[in-house]
Amino acid sequence: AFSGKARLNIYKVSFKIWKDHLILGSGYGSFLSIFRNYYAKERSIGSNVTSFGSKNVLHPHNEFLFWLVEGGILPVIGFLIMIIGFIKMTLKGGRQALASIGCFFPILFHTQLEYPFYNSTIHLILFVFFIYLIDKEYGVQYHFKNNLKIIPKLLAIIIPLCSVIFLLTVLQTGYMINKYEKTGFKKLEYLERALNPYSMKKKYDNLALKSHLIIAKKAKDQNMLKSYISIVEKNLKHSPFMFLYYDLATAYQALGNMEKAWEIYKKGKYLYPDANWKD
């Protein structure tokens, strides 16, 4: 969690990113990487920006600012047009409609200080559900004849069943990952038993890479080390995690390329100037 001062600094850096990518944004999925680079630049020039240590900033803690940074002004304009249209439709219902709009305010307020849509399915479901209720009550309704009456019944069974199966595989995957971590990254078979690694893809992939590096160093396998380096260098473009820089430098060191190892290490220290690095 970040303090009020830290959030203001996140807004400040995020706004600078948006000013440099005004129309089209920096690209979807780029916030983690581009924020880290802008933050490091601010720290390097002595700007009075709050220290984040080794913490990663995944979101600016403001939904509209998040869209501005990654998508630019265009998606925000589109969203505002939808909001205005929705409010106009709802106002036709009088005072009762205004009470319905009030259901949105707690969630909308939350989106300006946190990132509920980014990491909370419940917030998103509630938000969509409120839209559905208001649209059903005050919106224009269209009806069509469904000749295949069995389809809704089948979907009512299939969707919950698939959801339960998926959630069970997520729990099993989390359990296996936890067991693997408790072994000190030694028993790879726990990781291999995970049924749904895609549900925790980033965490799973990073753990798999960690085990890849451990095995490669132990076996002194240069091909495995080069393979690891190739994968991590690609990942760093969108996920510049501190531990990846440290491990990548270690991989180059294992290959005997100390010059490159120090280059990677210094790059990591530049991006994470407040972290506790071990020289």
Feature locations, PLM:
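Internal/C-terminal transmembrane anchor helices
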Residues: 146-174
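Interfacial juxtamembrane loops and adjacent helix segments
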Residues: 1-6, 10-12, 16-19, 26-70
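TPR/TPR-like (Sel1-like) alpha-helical repeat modules
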Residues: 259-274
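Hydrophobic transmembrane alpha-helices and their immediate junctions
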Residues: 71-99, 264
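Transmembrane alpha-helices of multi-pass inner-membrane enzymes
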Residues: 96-150
